[in-house]
Amino acid sequence: MTNGRIAFQGELGANSHEACTAAFPDMEPVPHPTFEDAFEAIKAGDCQLGMIPVENSIAGRVADVHHLLPSSGLKIIGERFKPIHFQLMANPGVKLEDLKVVQSMAIAIHQCRATVRRLGLKADTVGDTAGAARMLADHPDPHRAAIAPALAARIYGLDILARDIEDRHNNTTRFMIMTADADPEPPAAGADCVTSFVFRVRNLPAALYKAMGGFATNGVNMTKLESYMENGAFTATFFYAEVDGRPEDPALQRAFEELTFFSERFEILGTYPADPFRKQV
């Protein structure tokens, strides 16, 4: 897709914004304050695609997204892995020795705590990394800095005082590319693919064990299996899973047949090309 609009959660300059421009440079990135708003923009047709983070190599899964996916009606058509780098930025003319306070999301400050400690900065948490940069641009302060992606510094006219200050340089976020198209074009023939799905097993003894048996006996590689509660109920457990392959593959067809027999709900969220980044890890 070479035109149109792509939704993301956050403000202009966020990591999700960077992911949008890297994957779809000809599309217009459209910020939304919440994941719910981003999903709704895709469903309503205001945006043709969405770039949604689902997990981070340090912080783990994005819980809000896992709850939204099954009920969204959206399909996953792609994935992107993005290395995450944080920059320490301030208003023009400010020097490192002038700083006393740093502002950003709590998780961003936590991931850069070595630099924050070394500079002796007091942490001030806000809701968004790019938002921290925007607030600093709107209210200049010679003693305050922000931790945000490099794109935020360019957008809001801030100077980068220290680059790539994250403690761990293998910090990576995985994004899903979403569409409202109920029957999206399948991945190209021959491409390595991933299929994502959700299910809830029937109330039977060893139902989960039995539901999973078909994947082992048919040689299907399951790369992810996560549980989460539905509507806050401890007794209603959903499972989110990912496997290598396409639903039309004979082995996966047989595995899904066995899964559905032991499940009261089963839904494929999408089949999409595996990001080449997977081969680097």
Stretches found by the model and what they are:
Residues M1-V281:
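Domain-level signature for soluble enzymes in the chorismate/prephenate branch of the shikimate pathway
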